[in-house]
Amino acid sequence: NFPAPRRGPRGGPRGGPGQDKSPDAFRDFYDRFFNERPNQKPKRGMGSGFVIDKEGHILTNYHVVEGADEIVVMLESNGKEKEYTATLIGSDSKTDIALIKINRKPGDNTEFPFLELGSSENLEVGEWVVAIGNPFGLSHTVTVGVVSALGRSIGAGPYDEFIQTDASINSGNSGGPLFDMNGDVIGINTAILGKGGSIGIGFSIPSNSAKKVID
């Protein structure tokens, strides 16, 4: 059950590093590596995320939902996809984290399957990790790699201590979970280093950092 927020008519798509010009620190970092032209036409974008409680709160990246007029979430249950709209509850551009909530119809008491944030404190270089997301709109894609480095600074902002991994991360993976081999969410996939897609250098926000923001 991994949502795919989609951007409304303003602004451009988000996936790995974003494409629009903006003064915030994350966008400045992205623009150094992705010198895209400003958007000329309204577009939609896709990203990833994951449900963190039974009420339908979803954790994702700020750049996935930034400026969206509408957020649409796709959830799969028993092999069938169901579409919901969602509301932005809060966001922090400095850490690139956003919290959205699925809009349920009156009388709908659906309890959503969810993932709990684990601890990234004891993560070690060389540990196996699994990334799940929606790269290029290919939902529920699973890739495997290792932790390549910890506390990696990439010049993205004031809170700049990423998990580096060689698990394949591409445009559309942003906001998706990074798991350890115990099945705990230890990171939020956020950025890649490379213009054309994954080159084995991806970055995830540690789960402990995300906890501090959403708490």
Where are the model-predicted features located?
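Serine-dependent protease modules
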Residues: 1-215
